[in-house]
């Protein structure tokens, strides 16, 4: 009975939004592999300014922002952070080994998982300070919102700072690094940590009861949303595995095509 109630109260709309973002991300990465890894002249949208200016930011805002909202539901963000840190390290060292052994340019140093890990640990620290000091939640929300907005604004202006360094420790912050190795995937803390914090504020303000805002979902919507919700609920596993699976399938397909000629 309790499990059914939890399932009914679960904020399915967050799973749905994260699932939509992940599907769009999967399509983008598949397009990238076709066009750049296997040299197929399709998916030219990847070279269009409108995609990187408008569509790509929407995908990332959905994924990172919803993750921030979901952090306000967690009983232990420290445990979530440790779990995500482990997954991030596996991905980083895994791609490093593959890059060194095969020469495939798949190295990942700092990406969306790294941003989410930092965001979750930061929010866990904020929760700890809030609990210990008895701070007014409204003040905490205001400070987090302003900090998030400041980080977003800074992140949007980093490209115009024309700051360059040879210190790789600046990679997480989005600065240009001299001699920076090619990274198959990259996402800096600025502006995306700010988006995460703003997501936390939205979660605290709109999901105080930690329940869905759309409890009376119609049957037609259930049929459409369930597969997407499933993807959203298992986003970490899918994200970790998707590029290896997609690249592997395409490698086999193109190998068979070349062998048949």
Predicted region positions:
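Alpha-helical transmembrane segments and their immediate juxtamembrane cytosolic regions
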Residues: 1-261
């Amino acid at each position: 009975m309790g499990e059914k109630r939890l399932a009914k109260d679960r904020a399915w709309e967050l799973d749905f939004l994260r699932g939509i973002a992940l599907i769009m991300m999967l399509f983008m990465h598949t397009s990238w592999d076709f066009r750049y890894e296997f040299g197929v002249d399709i998916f030219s949208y990847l070279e269009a300014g409108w995609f990187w200016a408008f569509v790509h930011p929407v995908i990332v805002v959905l994924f990172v922002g919803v993750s921030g909202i979901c952090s306000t539901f967690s009983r232990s963000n420290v445990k979530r952070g440790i779990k995500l840190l482990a997954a991030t390290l596996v991905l980083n060292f895994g791609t490093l080994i593959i890059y060194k052994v095969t020469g495939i340019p798949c190295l990942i140093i700092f990406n969306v998982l790294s941003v989410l890990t930092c965001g979750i640990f930061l929010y866990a620290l904020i929760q700890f300070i809030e609990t210990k000091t008895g701070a007014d939640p409204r003040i905490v929300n205001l400070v987090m919102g302003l900090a998030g907005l400041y980080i977003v604004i800074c992140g949007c202006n980093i490209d115009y700072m024309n700051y360059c360094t040879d210190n790789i420790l600046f990679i997480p912050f989005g600065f240009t690094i001299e001699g920076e190795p090619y990274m198959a995937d990259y996402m800096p803390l600025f502006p995306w940590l700010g988006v995460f914090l703003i997501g936390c504020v939205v979660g605290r303000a709109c999901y105080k009861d930690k329940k869905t805002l759309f409890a009376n979902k119609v049957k037609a919507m259930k049929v459409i949303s369930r597969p997407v919700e499933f993807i959203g609920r298992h986003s970490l596993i899918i994200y970790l595995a998707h590029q290896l699976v997609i690249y592997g399938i395409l490698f086999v397909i193109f190998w068979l095509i070349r062998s048949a000629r």
